[in-house]
A protein has these predicted regions:
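Aromatic/basic-lined ligand-recognition segments
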Residues: 40-42, 55-59
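N-terminal interaction modules that seed assembly of large macromolecular complexes
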Residues: 20-47
Length: 122
């Protein structure tokens, strides 16, 4: 397991090319079990600030579905989301692949069955 979110993102994007048809990125979150959470990164062929279903137009998961970022945290789902929002905002400000992520139309994060929080849009 990667020691932190930044290392995990670096590993995913270092080992997987971004297809040319990708217009946005979404970090999908899952509640695995009590106090156990997971995240994957997908690239989408669509982005729309007015329609959260853009994240359903997945073109690739960059292999992250087989290599999820997992963490343990005793909290409610909204606290897990807030933790990841903070981590991802830090990454987008100074991470190794921050400019690559921000070069597309948008970057979002959210639970697969919930709302998406937009972290960056052009």
């Amino acid at each position: 397991m990667m020691k932190n979110v930044a290392d995990w993102i670096d590993n995913v994007l270092h080992n997987n090319a971004v297809p040319t048809d990708i217009v946005a990125f979404c970090f999908n979150l899952y509640e695995e079990s009590d106090s156990s959470w997971a995240m994957e990164l997908v690239g989408t062929e669509r982005f729309d600030l007015e329609d959260e279903d853009w994240a359903c137009n997945e073109a690739t998961d960059f292999g992250s579905r087989e290599n999820l970022y997992n963490w343990k945290m005793e909290c409610e789902w909204d606290e897990a989301l807030a933790y990841l929002v903070n981590e991802l905002k830090q990454y987008l400000s100074s991470g190794k692949y921050a400019e690559l992520l921000k070069s597309k139309e948008g970057v979002g994060v959210g639970f697969v069955d919930g709302n998406i929080e937009i972290l960056h849009s052009k």
